[in-house]
């Protein structure tokens, strides 16, 4: 046993220090990034935000809606090949190039993903997702996927430390998904005691990944557009959002009614709700590591997308970044004990 003495930070522990700016308007900020990925060699341009691969967020409807903002969607792994075929046949290439095909690490997952990727060459992204990316089996699966799909851009995770970022990139991942326990409906940290404050994880993993020519996506922990800006400021190439995009018409959650008011269910993918829906229940050897919440219906996701992008543009103007690419170089974090004046939050 050992203790690391240095303090690790989450998004709530910092603010971004403002700096002189020559920008006259938020409209002067360019949020689109252009990437060429290390292993696949593929080039992509767009806004580097990703809707999370949860079945109450990462739906076909969400992908269609967010593609108009140049935002990616990691479509959840529980759609059938037949459902994928119908979606591909009814969608334009502009939509499909903003889609990630999500998969687990079983042999059945691999075969299913192979069939989905064969439906249309515009499906260029694969998101290999497990809760614990530290297992040897996971690393081997990433290598297997890279060998099978040499020209596909592979996103793999989740991990929170630099050495595993390096391991996954060397095994074939183009993008490493960073985050254990920060999600709004994730209870891993309280069920297991395992985790890592998200901002520190992003900073450390970005440093490791960029040294090898790889990239990272910050997955979890964002509750406001300001948190998204902090993730990019900390070095994230992409930011994945779950709770911020939940509860919308496109989110896919089941709608329930209480006292005449309608709510949408949103749950973690290791929750009892998710396991009952997809695998028949919680296995006797494990505990649920997610919770289920009821969210008031939030309408179309386009309004939320505009709010997030607007906040991100504003953050860039405060530090003089004319492009999102410049935000990391212009970010200085200050440690704080308060984020906002909360006097009217209960009203």
From Swiss-Prot:
Q: Which PROSITE patterns match?
A: IMP_DH_GMP_RED
Q: Which organism is it from?
A: Escherichia fergusonii (strain ATCC 35469 / DSM 13698 / CCUG 18766 / IAM 14443 / JCM 21226 / LMG 7866 / NBRC 102419 / NCTC 12128 / CDC 0568-73)
Where is K(+) bound in this sequence?
Answer: 181, 183
Annotated NADP(+) binding lies at 108-131, 216-239
Q: What is its EC number?
A: 1.7.1.7
Q: Which cellular component terms (GO) are annotated to the entry? A: cytosol; GMP reductase complex
Supply the Gene3D superfamilies for this chain: Aldolase class I
Which family is this protein grouped under?
Belongs to the IMPDH/GMPR family. GuaC type 1 subfamily.
Name of the protein in question: GMP reductase
